[in-house]
């Protein structure tokens, strides 16, 4: 109790009140923000949410410590596992004894606790604290005291200096606690120590600049050293310019391999979008149904829910309906795919009508497998740009519950189900008298909704079989919808993409274990 109060007092003195010091997994914690929007990403008691060689990293008395007691042959890192960073502010306190360290951001995980990318440098010596260094890349990009613009081909333009390196070094406390702050907005990167701007970089070099990536701490190769971090606080920033951010929330594995491949599907969408509109749309994939990152939603422009639904839908657990409803009222776009369009009428139904204009309602909607026939696409809607009518066998739910009146819900994809799909026995998902009486009726399988708050909603009932993403028309329809839902203009010919057989299968969930025969037990 004394320790917790001590840490809170320290934070209060910095006007950064936070309190996530419980020994729990981050997924079970509600983010605690101060009035400036900072969120703690270190619980003060464990390495939960971080990955590194535990031989070198530990937690003591609320402090994250990296230490080597003998010469280290290769530089190693402690990597934040709960998300990636794009536009953000990071603030923390650090103390370093001997050697060199740094904060990696928007970086690449090379495996084996190795990292490449931007680094906010720190050291026990007099030369490098505050500089921008690119690990396993361009080396020193901006020295302390410099304002630089990095042009194509590595050409460097030096602007008006901030101050001399020596004067700025005098602001840093050697062997004591210092406050480091990183501000990254688009290609504009700033490093502050103890409130003093140390370096400022505008990175315009095509192919080198990075818009998002991992966050990590460094233990440098060489002499024994010790670096300590505490009060690690992250704040997401809304993306600058015309850029948008899409979160792809993939549910847990639930079916045999090849079906309900939520993770593989989201990763495939991410690759296609990165290849086609990566300069304007930043994507982040979160697995297991919901982000572990307590800051994930803070700068999102749109969200895809691709998961199992019904009573197990991730969005109806805990207080998440209220959380997403607040985002929707802010104008965040929401898209739902396949089973993700189903929620209980009494818990989520009203919200889905408000968010995306419709949902799968049990004892009203049905879930047969069938091949599209007599397909029609909406005319003059951006989601249908470059898409031609297609035939795909899938679990196409139909007879959705839509807003009333539904004039503001656009029918994106419609088809006429075989009469045989209306002849199944009645059940929660299988059939009902209304469906049975509508033989030959055209049904809505994908729809779009423009909300009064300015946000956009989209729903599609297909997506059961992962192999169907090999169909260029179906895949383009979904990619177009994700771009549109994010608030970005869809190209006239749609989002072009190519998916190889390898890309289609490389991220599949492993086959589930065989079911035990109860009679044999």
Where do the language-model regions lie?
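Structural recognition of the beta-strand scaffold that forms the well-ordered cores
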Residues: 65, 104, 119-122, 245-250, ...
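Solvent-exposed loop/turn segments at secondary-structure junctions
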Residues: 71-72, 95-99, 110-111, 125-128, ...
């Amino acid at each position: 109790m004394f320790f917790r109060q001590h840490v809170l007092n320290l934070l209060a003195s910095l006007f950064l009140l936070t309190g996530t010091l419980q020994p729990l997994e981050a997924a079970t914690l509600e983010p605690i923000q101060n009035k400036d929007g900072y969120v703690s990403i270190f619980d003060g008691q464990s390495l939960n949410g971080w990955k590194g060689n535990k031989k070198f990293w530990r937690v003591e008395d609320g402090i994250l410590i990296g230490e080597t007691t003998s010469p280290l042959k290769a530089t190693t890192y402690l990597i934040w596992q709960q998300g990636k960073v794009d536009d953000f502010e990071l603030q923390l306190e650090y103390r370093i004894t001997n050697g060199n360290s740094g904060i990696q951001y928007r970086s690449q995980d090379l495996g084996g606790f190795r990292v490449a990318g931007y680094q906010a440098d720190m050291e026990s010596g007099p030369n490098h604290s505050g500089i921008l260094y690119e690990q396993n890349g361009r080396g020193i990009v901006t020295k302390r005291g410099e304002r630089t613009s990095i042009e194509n081909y590595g050409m460097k333009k030096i602007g008006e200096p901030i101050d001399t390196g020596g004067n700025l070094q005098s602001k840093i406390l050697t062997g004591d606690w210092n406050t480091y702050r990183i501000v990254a907005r688009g290609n504009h990167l700033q490093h502050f120590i103890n409130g003093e701007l140390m370096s400022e970089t505008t990175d315009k070099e095509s192919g080198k600049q990075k818009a998002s990536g991992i966050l990590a701490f460094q233990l440098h190769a060489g002499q024994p050293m010790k670096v300590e971090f505490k009060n690690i606080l992250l704040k997401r920033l809304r993306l600058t310019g015309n850029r948008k951010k899409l979160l792809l929330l993939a549910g847990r594995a639930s079916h045999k391999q090849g079906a309900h491949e939520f993770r593989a599907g989201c990763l495939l969408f991410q690759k296609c979008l990165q290849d086609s509109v990566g300069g304007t749309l930043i994507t982040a994939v979160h697995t297991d149904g919901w982000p572990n990152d307590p800051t994930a939603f803070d700068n999102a422009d749109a969200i895809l829910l691709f998961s199992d639904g019904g009573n197990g839908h991730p969005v109806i657990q805990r207080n998440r309906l209220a959380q997403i409803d607040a985002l929707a009222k802010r104008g965040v776009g929401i898209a739902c795919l396949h089973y993700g369009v189903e929620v209980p009428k009494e818990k989520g139904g009203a919200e889905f009508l408000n968010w995306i204009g419709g949902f799968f309602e049990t004892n009203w909607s049905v879930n047969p497998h069938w091949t599209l026939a007599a397909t029609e696409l909406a005319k003059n809607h951006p989601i249908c740009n470059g898409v031609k009518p297609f035939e795909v066998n899938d679990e196409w739910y139909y007879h959705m519950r839509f807003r009333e009146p539904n004039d503001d819900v656009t029918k994106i994809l419609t088809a006429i189900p075989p009469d045989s799909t209306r002849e199944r026995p009645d059940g929660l998902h299988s059939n009902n008298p209304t469906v049975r009486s509508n033989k030959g009726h055209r049904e809505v399988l994908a729809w779009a909704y423009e909300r009064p708050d300015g946000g956009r909603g989209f729903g599609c009932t297909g997506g059961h079989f992962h192999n169907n993403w090999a169909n260029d028309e179906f895949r383009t329809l979904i990619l177009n919808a994700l771009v549109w839902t994010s608030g970005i203009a869809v190209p006239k010919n749609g989002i072009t993409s190519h998916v190889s057989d390898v890309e289609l299968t490389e991220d599949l969930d492993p086959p589930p274990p065989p079911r035990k025969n109860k009679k044999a037990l």
